[in-house]
Design a protein with these regions (language model features):
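A generic structural micro-feature
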Residues: 23-25, 43, 59
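N-terminal first-folded block
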Residues: 1-27
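Solvent-exposed beta-strand sheet faces enriched in polar/charged residues
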Residues: 23, 32-34, 68-70
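A short acidic, often aromatic-flanked loop/helix-cap motif at beta-alpha or helix-coil junctions
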Residues: 28-30, 75-76
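Residue-level signature for short turns and capping positions that connect secondary-structure elements
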Residues: 27, 36-38, 72
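A short interface-forming secondary-structure element
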Residues: 33-45
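C-terminal structural segments of small proteins and small subunits
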Residues: 47-76
Length: 76
């Protein structure tokens, strides 16, 4: 079963992040991701970056992922 820590490590390995927090029950996950890479990007483009970091896991192992994607300045 996929754990929140698995998802966190996968995101961190594929995307330069200042902060990643993931919670979930093994299929449904919620994530807060802070990255300078999100500067100037729409929410859709930000989510696409995260999906890219997750690769095939997003289809095979994760039923649902809710994301809050922020830049460092948006996080405050």
């Amino acid at each position: 079963m996929t754990t929140p820590d698995d998802i966190k490590r996968t995101i961190e390995a594929g995307l330069a992040c200042e902060h990643v927090a993931v919670d979930g029950d093994g299929q449904h996950f919620q994530a807060v991701i802070v990255s300078a890479a999100f500067e100037g990007l729409s929410r859709v483009k930000r989510h696409q970056l995260v999906y890219g970091a997750l690769g095939d896991r997003i289809r095979a192992e994760i039923h649902a992922l809710s994301m809050q994607t922020l830049t460092p300045s948006e996080r405050g």
